Amino acid sequence: MINLIRTNSENKGFIDLVKLLDAELAALDGDEHVFYAQLNKTDTIKHVIVAYENDTPISCGAIREYSPTTMEVKRMYTLPGHRGKGIATKVLNELEKWASELSYQKCILETGWRQPDAIRLYEKNGYSRIPNYGKYAGIANSVCFEKEITG
């Protein structure tokens, strides 16, 4: 059984999963990883979801405020052996629910062109592509999305 918990970036399960995520992204991004790493600091994230299976952390995601009306989805990751089972969708849905409870109106996010599974996840969950925003503007490997979460 999958159990989702709301926590923050000090959660050990989240920290362990993010280390695995960073290693995977370093292999995918190559020389560009240094640029992306500076945008993915996790030390002050207040809103984190960790999915556990039998007390083992298997998936995570986070949101942080981008603007007074918008949360940015960050650090989405699922262990390779647990992918394709809908766990990331559950984490994403819980993040959106949390953002809505906090009175935010939409979520935005950035992922990489080298991550087709992530792109499919966001598209199948109702995210629409938008021009690259903020520090991702002009970055060829980035693809950005948004989704209205109130309605």
Indicate residue ranges for each PLM-predicted region:
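Conserved phosphate-binding and hydrolysis motifs of nucleotide-dependent enzymes
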Residues: 55, 59, 86-88, 126
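Conserved GNAT acetyl-CoA-binding A-motif
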Residues: 92, 99-111
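Acetyl-CoA-dependent GNAT
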Residues: 2-74, 79-80, 92-93, 132-135, ...
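Short coil/turn segments at alpha/beta junctions that flank glycine-rich nucleotide-binding fingerprints
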Residues: 69, 85, 101-105
